[in-house]
């Protein structure tokens, strides 16, 4: 079938008519006005010959007047890739031969340089794409433009946005001419510009109808003709929006805060990981008396904090919680919404916190015990070692394994040996700013918290450094092959013994995004470990080894601690004793922050192993293509498959595609309102001179060097002295810090994993720098100032050698900064 009337097309015929024609067919089915037209199908394109007779007959039926000839590729107007402007459109084409020529030109545009590059960036194979062409009667517009049925800047589904201009809408679509801009929020529109209020209202009504009926916010091209009739020329999903929260029957609006920022994890969580994490998080929060609904939005974990925001007592405490655990971005969002009347405190809704009351006695005893006996940390590591070594027996069948996967892990009898020292370390570090008010600056306190002992992530990185030193004789081998090749060789037992097996016995249950049970551990997929080893082998100056850097950070910390105690003692002897006590306890206990998670990962390791055993059985039964495909099923779905033999392969394929799309997403909102509004877009814009990026200082010191922009740590390398620029950082990223001269991230919290490790190594860190990975390019010279919280970009013509660029300089600056403060 080579030619179809638009009115005869089924919207599901995308492979035959392409995205644009399928979208127009959907509009026609909804009863909105669409200019008459026809589609030259992909069958004709596959044969490479324009069906002349059929096209001319269809053109005659349109009246043989001016028409628009528009590309309609099968990979166009997709839910995750619009292809806007990537293939050609020809307007006001008139005459049979010109129409035929325009159709051929649309076909040719499928392989244009811009369309090919767009498909490559979107991960769409070139061979899988075919082209149809839409031919429609031209509308002679009085005014035309674009309607977004959600606000593309804020994400709000409560607003429609219109850009309009007199005449053809191409000037608006192409950005070639100024347009009148309208944000339609349901209030009476203004009388201004080229769009009358009645037309604004009509566009909003149409937009809301399309959004509701088509199941997603739409980007709509429209035109009003000289008679005042509204025509819709195209509708496609807005592909850049972050998904909106699921509908809730609770009174709105609701506030959802993303939990991945706490862990430095922005990639989507697999469905099986989501099942596990929602259960774990809800249980953890309940133990502290907090009932928080955990929801999946775009594959990320968000918590509904609306009730806490409206509680007269907890709303102010929430700001402090955000500052400590969620970071300055979340803190700014909560502070902003405290003044929003929609989140005004509501009296009489506070519930008795019975869970917290039940936990309080244990907490008091545990915290006081940790403060009195910090050496009890030895029990922490004893418990961790026991959890890692305890024997586990796996039953042989999926039916027997699944209950072990489904059950909530019961707290181990010795877990309290970990919990209270960890909690105490976090609390002591958190009270230091108040205790040392008017005595120490934030950067000085961060110096004290550098080079801290007992941090399992630091110990892991240092252990890998020792593996690298042992591997020195194999340097050529390890630098000459890719991390993936080396990983395959290691798993096959084909590499020399460099101590990596011993390292993985202890740390192989870790990885980037390690809280997701669906993500392979290093023991299964050690390519990131080999990438880190390659980085370490490039360190030729022993003084820049992580062990030396850690030692220097510890020396600076002890010197600063002594200086702060002296300052406090000069003011009042009692304050000096208190300062000394809490500063020393902070250094002794705050490094344990990672221990609880590290221990909990053993249970996650066992759960993943059992999931893979179930997956292997399902693969043998033909229900999965690969054992690891089990990660794309939730636990309830997995139960249905194991018990009833449901075939999950179609669900798995759809989830894989969705997961791959979300992996490409570059930004994840730290907080959303229930209508999809990204709350950060409501905050006042930061001022900038174009060269200075502002964030939050998280590790003191100053360093200048070439940037290394990394979005995935799996196979990344960082040359000694380069400044690592990343979207985030969790423990799976920290091996890259050993060669970095500084750290810049787009997210994070001062006490989170990345900044903590940066302080241990004495490298400056600035976190929460908006758009850092887009605004900074690899190789660009930048200066990181951890005290000021700034990243300064060199002018394009600046000499790369114009300042310090390696770790020595970064450490020297940090030392001088600390020494200068100590003498103040």
Show where each model-derived region lies:
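Acidic, glycine-rich flexible loop/linker segments
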Residues: 199, 203-218, 225-242, 707-722, ...
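Structural motif
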Residues: 33, 38, 66-68, 88, ...
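Phosphate-interacting basic helix/loop segments used at nucleotide- and nucleic-acid interfaces
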Residues: 49-66, 132, 199-220, 224
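N-terminal beta-alpha lobe that positions the nucleotide/phosphoryl donor
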Residues: 1-134, 143, 384-400, 406, ...
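Extended active-site and interfacial segments that coordinate phosphate-rich ligands
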Residues: 21, 86-117, 140-197, 232-286, ...
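Conserved phosphate/anionic-ligand binding catalytic regions in large, soluble enzymes, centered on
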Residues: 15-41, 70-99, 138-180, 218-241, ...
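Contiguous hydrophobic, helix-prone segments at protein termini
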Residues: 212-215, 226-227, 242, 269-697
